[in-house]
Amino acid sequence: PGTPGRLNDLRHIIYKPADAPWRRARKSLGLMLREGILKENIDGEALLWAHDRLLARNEDRRIMMVISDGAPVDDSTLSANSGSYLERHLREVISYIETLSPVELLAIGIGHDVTRYYSRAVTITDVEQLGGAVVGQLTDLFDEDANKQRHRVA
């Protein structure tokens, strides 16, 4: 076919299930550093998968934080489709989540400007800044909520 769609296989890894205690996840978290475990970046489908997992949870509030070091890439898919195929899909998924979903979406780009994709996003230049960026993003989100509450009461 002329435009076959995504051609690469997917690998979604759960390093720590939400209900598992941190102490049981140590070994799994170490797998993040294992060479060859990750596939190419098919970000739109990964977001949808994580989004659906969050929706299945019975929580009052669901927050998804994306940490990205680059744009969606899959050489096979990009060679058989338009060069913007994966990026366009990512933008569609983000738009859906940000406008129609109860899931709150935040993003942090490491050496990659994610503010062009996500409404609530920040870009850092070094992984050493990640801890502060995570806390900052969550603080901003909760401050937004506090401001909304104050405006409702006033």
Predicted regions mapped to residue ranges:
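Acidic, glycine-rich A-domain
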Residues: P1-A154
